[in-house]
Amino acid sequence: MKSIQSNIKKAKKYLDNNHCVAVPTETVYGLAANAYSNSAVKKIFSLKKRPLNNPLIVHYYDIQRLKEDCDINDNLVKLYKKFSPGPITYVLKLKNNSKISKFVTNNKKSIAVRFPKHKLLRNLLKNLDYPVAAPSANISSRLSSVKPSDVKEEFGSKIKYILNGGKSKIGVESTILNLLEKPSLLRYGGLDTKKIENVLKKKLLINTNSKKKLSSGLFPLHYSPGIPLRVNVKKPKKDEAYFCLLYTSPSPRDLSTSRMPSSA
């Protein structure tokens, strides 16, 4: 217990001094920084080599702290009571007097927020005076990190500290909902959309506006393997391996499609 508290204090010290810290979540590891600090948030973009027009998800301890920065609506309250903390992100209206860094939202009047379930991160958030912006801890468009060694492989000594919380249980990012108007799905993720619809008692609209980037994970290039990929291969060459995608969704509406690049 003492070592856990010591690690949390160490992570807090780095965050308080506007450094980036890798943190565990139930979905994937995040690269965290003080969401109220422009200089800290800019370090996230620099380390990840991430475009500045790609908004970040901000992690809060609870809905009471969220009220300082966002307008709370009925749909959020319903979903929060059922699924948060957990692998779901909400896009909400940002208050005019919010202290959230403009780099988090790309100067938009909306923000993507979530309440992580991992006990270690929740303990850290409870002890901070600010929420943290925390996109996945990987170079932009590369595969997400699900354990400390993945983070170390991606960034080496470029980040100050990795808060070791073991392997992420879910392994894929959070489901993202737009709650600015009628609830709509922006990204499939760690929470089944059917469960969300059961709580809302309505079908989710599917986001079709690819130009309006309200949250992270909405760019055409998101997951890119670091080695060449060949498709429709009958026999692998030496040092190659098969990569198989299994479709287990109960409904075709849960499929996202994209044209493969010519280099694949």
Model-derived segments and spans:
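Active-site-adjacent structural elements in enzyme catalytic cores
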Residues: 1-249, 253
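Positively charged, low-complexity/disordered segments
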Residues: 252-254, 258-264
